[in-house]
Amino acid sequence: MATALFISRTDLVKNTIVSGATDTDLFIQYVKISQEIHLESYLGSKLYDKISADIIADTLTGDYLYLVTEFLQPMLIHYAMTSYLPFASYSVKSGGIFKHSSENSETASKDEVDFLVQKEREFAEHYTRRFVDYICFNSSKFPEYTSNKESDVYPDKDVNSSNWVL
């Protein structure tokens, strides 16, 4: 079965620090991973599957289109960045794992990458809070949101994903 991605390469490049010259193959898997981990957990299986099917069939309209463009795409853009950034400077080739460097630039430190990841997480959580507020007040527009059964993923309504600090 085909996988529907809720954002395009253009969405990611236009709304993040990812350069337009970056090869799609370097980050596309992080979009898919973030979509499956984060979006499905907030949508639940039934609504996630409905939106995926509509995207594949090119029939996404009305309230569902609004939900995707206003809430899900911004969430996914920033969740994908939290997944991609820690790996952005590495590549795995037949000779091993390599860290990229440039003659006229400086590689970001781990602390700098962690800072960027945290900022992207804050953006993602902001859009997620907006989504949760919207879907709670408008769940009647999306019957799939409340129709999960048995082994389906049930929608998560808790946005706080921050790490514990003791």
Stretches with model-predicted labels:
Residues 1-73, 87-95, 99-100, 106-108, ...:
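Conserved short "hinge" loops at termini or chain/domain junctions
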